[in-house]
Amino acid sequence: MDALIRAGSEIDAHDTALRGPLPPEAPLAMPEQSFAAAPDREADRAAAAAPNEWRRLAIMLATAALTCAGGYEMYQVLQVGGVTILEGIVLALFAALFAWVALSFVSALAGFVALLSGWHDDLGVAADGPLPAISNRIAMLLPIYNEQPQAVFARLQATRESVELTGHGAQFDWFILSDTTDPAVWIAEEKCYLALASSGERLFYRHRQFNHARKSGNIEDWVKRFGAGYDCIVILDADSMMTGEALVRLAAAMQRHPDVGLIQTLPIVVKARTLFARLQQFAGRMYGPMIASGIAWWHGSESNYWGHNAIIRVAAFAACTGLPSLPGRKPFGGHILSHDFVEAALLRRAGWRIHMAPTLPGSYEECPPSLLDFAARDRRWCQGNLQHAKLLKARGLHWVSRLHFLTGIGSYITAPMWLAFLVAGILISLQAQFVRPEYFPKGYSLFPDWPAQDPVRAAWVFAGTMGLLMMPKLLALILVVIRRESRRGFGGAARAAAGVVTETLISSLTAPVMMIFQSTAIAEILLGRDAGWNVQHRGDGAIPLREIARRYAAPSWLGAVMAVSALLVSWPLLLWMMPVILGLVLAIPVALLTSRTLAKHRAGAMLATPEDAEPPILSRAGEIAATLRDASPAEDPLLQLRNDPVLRELHFAGLAHQPARPRGRVDPALALARAQIDDAACIAEVVDWLDPREKHAVMGSRDTLQRIMRMP
């Protein structure tokens, strides 16, 4: 297999280029949906979900009880001497934030009890045992955008080989759906495709010249062209993988449950190479299964979709999830960015059940290597989630789907709310320190009004809030420790506990900076700034010191100002704010520490996870990536097409599937490129004169590219 991947035979590569990178089309209509009118449903396919209502009632009642208790205690803290306007603001912010914390705690507690009692997902997707037989046709879709091709294709090939080992490989077709705009990356993708296509059939590659509607438009284009040929699709991310066993079990579950439209798995973070990524890997593996089981337990057939590592019924997806553009200008209008939540809501609106399989192993992903990379991705997600505010009143949605929208919005707006809570607390302290109080109100009174708060009760409120935040970590640790296999995977009880402490301490230092980043993102969005579609950085987290200093300067200065201000007021205020101040003041050294690449043995020793003993699919992906990387030339993409007839033949075969340019519409980059080509005497001048955007336009124009290929 490695020999085929390394070079392939000239005959196989030539045959691949001749037959083209795509199968015959099987069109499927995907009508645009309306949020103003609910569709007519022949029957509610999710009627069996009624037993879940008592679970949801229990979750909501417990959350409400905790929120009322916390709000009452905070009121008792503030009401001594009467509640001022500032104290009223603090109370309102505290109640909203405490409700968020309470819901997270109650949901995690439900997951703890569910896993402790042996609960599995409602569909019975078995984690082990004999593999079931499947007869449905599955399309594996990998949408990519300017990614590192060798790593992306290696992950897909490792997944593909894993499926072949199950004996069900004939049921799966594999599609790489490229929206790449970098011409060098485009050519590298085609070379990787040639290398892998010669090692087996049913692997296809499609490149879109114009990436309309980004990822959702990429998937929609495939559905409209090929969707009728398949029963289900599995959407992968550029950094995700799934084992063959997991995919076969998901396909079998879709066969057994014809009323299910989507099943979401829990992707486990793997292959972390920096301390920041390692913290995410440890936290996801330690706490993720319990948290996911909790939400799956009470979400039931109204679960959510996270955009990848999920199986979807094609007919349902096509009929129900054609996304319109939102009215208004960006960032709130335009194409829907966080389309996954919306697609799940539309499927459920049409009566299809949406489930989660949180205990199914074999679903993996990687994560950004540094906090800056995480924040860059988070900025796009923030804008997409805030767009959902426009959809809360969409007709026909299930109330749990609306709750998904609200929790997605809340995951970002809580950051500026925490910031406002801190600022209001500082202002109350300043008011007490510098504003002369009115001891005797207007009118007759025997007793003065002493402005004060109850410090003892305040300490208990703080302790209770911290307890709700920390308890899910402790519950997850208990689940790991009491299970022999899990305990061994984390390196034993002591190392697991040490990992929880380490993750908690470092995460506490990075949380204030993330609060500032998210608050800034909210402000930018409200000011009308669009996130765009930037290339996501993967791999190591190496960031120049100058860049770290520039990006973290504002949080660091803010922390210093807060520290000095608190110290001028009182030592107790400084101590109360110390967790936030430390995270901000130490932002630059913490960023340097967490973005540093770790030696493999050090990472495993500090924050061990079961995936440190790499599953075969992970090690195989690394082997394939190394092979593909060794075969990648650094030559200009136009020269590679000129010098490699097989690559050129494949490229032109792919252009045959490009949609025709509408009459009267001019591509400015292509027009500029053609003008320069007219002046060029040879291909070397074309290569030298054209910028990447113009080369991309030329490589998508069959006639123009043929002209260049004929130049001396």
UniProtKB/Swiss-Prot annotation:
Its EC number is 2.4.1.-. The keyword Transmembrane helix applies. It is a multi-pass membrane protein. It is an enzyme of class 2 (transferase). Belongs to the glycosyltransferase 2 family. OpgH subfamily. Involved in the biosynthesis of osmoregulated periplasmic glucans (OPGs). This is Glucans biosynthesis glucosyltransferase H. The lineage of its organism: Bacteria, Pseudomonadati, Pseudomonadota, Alphaproteobacteria, Hyphomicrobiales.
